[in-house]
Amino acid sequence: VIVAIGLLDQIDERGEASRQKTQASQLLTGLDWILAENQSTESIYFGKVEAAKVASMGMSCGGLQAIQISADPRITITVVCNSGVLPDPSPIPGMPPLSKDALKDFHGPVLYLMGGPSDIAYKNAMDDFARVDHVPIVMTNLDVGHAGTYARPHGGEYTPVALAWLDWQLKGRKEASGMFLGEDSTLKRDPEWSIETKNFDQ
């Protein structure tokens, strides 16, 4: 189950200027909803949601929202895409007012999917990685900039990396860890990617 902010059938009806700003709290509202549906015998989702395996994911400002809600004890893992916490809380309206202290609230494994040095969030993300020493964390970079590979067919090169992370961390498929861990990992052997990992028991 994927809980996201907004309805797909509204996208074509809204121009760029009319797009609504969202809050991280809306993600937790969505999580509250699906977990309640999981308990309701009248819901099509009754008994179908694994409540102990929840990923918080987001891109750019949404990545900051993903970090912000990762303090919630129900969040199992975090995926931060093309994002990183600014050195000082942003004064920009609508952007999560996070400080680097938010990184201390991670309590599960974290994956960063970044666009390399040309990604506007690159320096912030690399600083995040350097600061996190209490949970397993992976930093991946593909030199595609801040827009990532989302517009490419099937989400492009980011997709197999994200799926391998979810398979490994949420589904317990240990073979998927081969994407990330060890000198012979899939991403280590791919010259297009760079990867750093730490805090894993190997």
Regions found by a protein language model. Give the residues of each.
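Conserved alpha/beta-hydrolase
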Residues: 1-12
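Alpha/beta-hydrolase active-site loop
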Residues: 17-52, 56
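Extracytoplasmic/secreted proteins, especially bacterial periplasmic and envelope-associated proteins
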Residues: 22-29, 33, 127, 157, ...
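Gly/Ala-rich beta-loop-alpha elbow adjacent to hydrolase catalytic centers
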Residues: 58-62, 66
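Conserved hydrolase catalytic core segment
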Residues: 68-76
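The feature captures the conserved acid-bearing segment of alpha/beta-hydrolase catalytic domains
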Residues: 76-152
